[in-house]
């Protein structure tokens, strides 16, 4: 916003001192620059967001700059983690192409961790993977130090991380490691602009091959994920209704189309329900009709469950993206801090063209601000 340019108070913005295991792109060239901060926000540093800018070959910078152009000026200004020179280049190149405004990097506060080499839009590799890995790690450090109260992450490319030597399935697993927890859960949430109803879908398994899903669906895992989903939904309703999707067609057809429902899911759900009578638990339901009520609730035509447990990645993401592609937010649960991200990828095919839509990033930032205060 234009009001951010009228800044009077200077604040030092430096990377945190971290153990030697913290990755660095080029420590000798880290020319950190401080940005001014509005007087009204000077005492609100712990209430602001930290935003890692994602893979520099993707659309992360574009959607962040577009989202910040619409960020309410009365909210604390987020702290960005990335490369200033690269961000300024993106702004210069994208501004004439973009149909919507972009925030001027000159008015934004940023921890500057420079890129060691030029990155071309759409061409991810070891250099871009090393950068996005470092930026994420530094953004987490800012949250853990209390300088920010929530983390928003722009998309990264897993193959770029792997090329840089960072063998993680995704950002969620890296966040769990940095936080010192065994795992974090992926929840996708969106609020219908038509009805106000909130879609909440949690994944029982995440980035694993489909062939590995049945073996991963232990009773303990399913019950653990239900605990996480119920706890989140109880923020909004004390006695929530949860729905669990089946794994097989027709939810196994009483064991005729697969035994996972009979042998694992149904006993696990019954035992969990006995321990949690305050929650209405339904399932396992046939996956092809499990989210029908969600579609009606999104349109304002009916009520639906407060939360859905999907058993594998695409089972949960297909209904989420059909209903709320531009509004959905990925929220990591089970961490000691709040993390959200947009529900889309790096967008390499459209990087550098100025046409990326920022609604999901805007929703991720708004959700982080809302949930961190809940």
Question: Where does each model-flagged region fall?
Answer:
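Low-acidity, Ser/Thr- and Arg-rich intrinsically disordered low-complexity segments
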Residues: 3-12, 17, 22-24, 29-34
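Anion-binding alpha/beta catalytic cores of soluble intermediary-metabolism enzymes, centered on
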Residues: 36-304, 308-374
């Amino acid at each position: 916003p234009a009001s951010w340019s009228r800044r009077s108070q200077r604040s030092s913005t430096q990377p945190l001192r971290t153990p030697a295991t913290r990755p660095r792109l080029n420590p000798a060239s880290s020319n950190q620059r401080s940005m001014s901060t509005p007087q009204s926000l000077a005492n609100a540093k712990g209430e602001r967001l930290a935003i890692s800018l994602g893979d520099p070959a993707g659309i992360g910078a574009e959607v962040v700059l577009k989202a910040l152009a619409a960020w309410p000026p009365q909210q604390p200004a987020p702290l960005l983690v990335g490369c200033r020179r690269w961000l300024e280049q993106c702004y210069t190149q994208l501004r004439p192409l973009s149909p919507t405004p972009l925030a001027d990097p000159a008015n934004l506060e940023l921890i500057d961790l420079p890129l060691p080499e030029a990155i071309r839009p759409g061409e991810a590799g070891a250099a871009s993977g090393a950068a996005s890995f470092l930026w994420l790690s530094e953004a987490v450090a800012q949250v853990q130090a209390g300088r920010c109260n929530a983390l928003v992450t722009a998309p990264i490319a897993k193959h770029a991380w792997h090329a840089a030597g960072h063998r993680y399935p995704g950002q969620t697993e890296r966040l769990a490691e940095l936080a010192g927890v065994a795992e974090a859960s992926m929840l996708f949430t969106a609020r219908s602009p038509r009805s106000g109803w909130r879609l909440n879908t949690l994944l029982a398994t995440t980035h694993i091959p489909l062939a590995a899903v049945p073996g991963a669906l232990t009773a303990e895992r399913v019950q653990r994920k239900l605990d996480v989903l119920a706890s989140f939904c109880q923020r909004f309703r004390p006695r929530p209704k949860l729905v669990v999707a089946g794994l097989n067609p027709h939810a196994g057809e009483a064991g005729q189309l697969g035994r996972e429902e009979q042998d694992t899911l149904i006993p696990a759900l019954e035992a969990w329900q006995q321990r949690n009578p305050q929650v209405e638990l339904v399932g396992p339901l046939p996956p092809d009709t499990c989210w029908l009520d969600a579609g009606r609730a999104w349109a304002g035509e009916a009520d639906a469950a407060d939360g859905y447990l999907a058993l594998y990645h695409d089972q949960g993401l297909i209904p989420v993206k059909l209903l709320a592609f531009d509004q959905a937010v990925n929220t990591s649960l089970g961490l000691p801090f709040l993390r959200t991200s947009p529900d889309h990828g790096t967008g390499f095919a459209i990087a550098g063209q100025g046409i990326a839509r920022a609604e999901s990033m805007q929703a991720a930032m708004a959700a982080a601000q809302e949930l961190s205060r809940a």
